[in-house]
Structures are given as structure tokens and as C-alpha cells.
Amino acid sequence: MDKDAMITYLIGELKKENLELHDLIIPEELEEKQKLLRALFNTRKPKAASTQFLTIQDLYLQVRKGERGFVQLSSLQPIPQDDRIYLWKGDITRLEVDAIVNAANKTLLGCMKPLHDCVDNAIHTYAGVQLRQACFELILEQGYEEPVGMAKITPAYNLPSAFVIHTVGPKIVDQPTQIDEDLLAKSYLSVLALAEKNNIESIAIPCLSTGDFNFPKQKAAKIAIQTVKTFINESSIIKKVIFNVFDDENLAIYQKLLAE
């Protein structure tokens, strides 16, 4: 089965699951068809999927992983000041490390906005539908939504990493309060503590709360760097931390702060 056939099959199965999609027209062009599939992945509610669906989905996502390319830690350079710390600008879903961190929302179910350009959306897209189901089961077992500053771990499924650690950072309405700053630090600490508990040696962390959650980037970076440095100085497990940024503004902020 080639990629086009896999996409057509997966869209067909997703249409069968949702009566609202009955009249959905599948585009002819491969690129548009691929976008439609991602949008359907994004909006699919957590539920079990058939073995055949998962098999073909996993094959498709492995093809996509090859097309998009993955980045090995050995190809990156640590910062001159500390060989345990890396700064990398790029798509976190391409990193082949022990764990990547997801800037999640309190449901842990991923971003359900079709084709939205956020890390939560990308991670759930390229991990596969298993990730949303796993997160749903964690919250169901917990009995309440994920509190700000806490963290959960799941397999990474079809991502190059082995695990995804999900954390909910504080959401800022105006300016961050001291409580907000403490909660952001707590998110980083919860992530690192969970990584250590699971013997994770290499971990990539995005700029938590600085996207849709509106935490000021400069202040967030200071909190991130200080919290990570303090933790790994006392950890015998975590060997490598990659600060993952997605834009030039955060890249410049981290470069300056890490050089101090």
C-alpha cells in the first residue's frame, strides 16, 4: 500500500466513525489529502481504534517521519558553557531523544484546532491517535483535569523519541504574578522529576507557556534556565537537556541568557 492509498483508507475510516463527516469530499491532490487527514486526526475524540486502522496509521506516520527527517542528539552541539545543555531551533517532533515535553492543556487531550501551529497539535499529530487515548485514560484514572504545574508521561508512539512528558503551564491574562512564575518553575521541576523517575537521560523542552498562554518570553526563559540548571546539578540521571525554540525571538533570548 503506497502513501496515497494509506491516506485514503485512513480518511475513509475516520469518516465512518463520525456521521457528521458523511458528505466530506476527499480531495484528489496528495498534499491536500494529507492536510485533510491531519485535520481529522486533530479533531478526532479519544476512542479505541481497530488494529487494522492503527497498523496502517503507524505505517503512514513512519513514512512521514522518514520524509520529515529526524534529528539525533549526536548531531547537535552543546553550548560552550555547559556540555549538558543544548539550544536548538526546530520542530520538537523530529528530535530523537529519550523524551520530549509537550506544552499541554488541562485536558491533556491535545490541541483539537484543525492544522493549528502549536507544539501540542504537532505532537499529537505525529504520535498518532494512541496518544490522545492514552492521555484520556490518564485523566479518567486521575478523576480530574491536570493541574497547572504538574506532569504526566506517556509513550511517544510514532515519534522519534521514546516518551512524551505532558505539562500544563500557567496561562497569563495581563502580567504574570509571583504565583504564575512559581507555577511555571513548578512545571519544569515536575517534568524533570518525572524524567528522573523514569531514568530518562536526554530530554527536549519547549518554551512552556510562551505561546497561546502568553507568558512573557524573556521572563519565562530566565525561569526555565535557572530551574533546569539547578535541577541537573543535583541529578545523576539526566545527562542532556535540549532547550527547544521555534522562533528567532526565543532563540536570541536563550542565546543571550545561556551565555551569561
Predicted regions and their residues:
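Macrodomain-like recognition of ADP-ribose-binding/processing modules
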Residues: 1-260
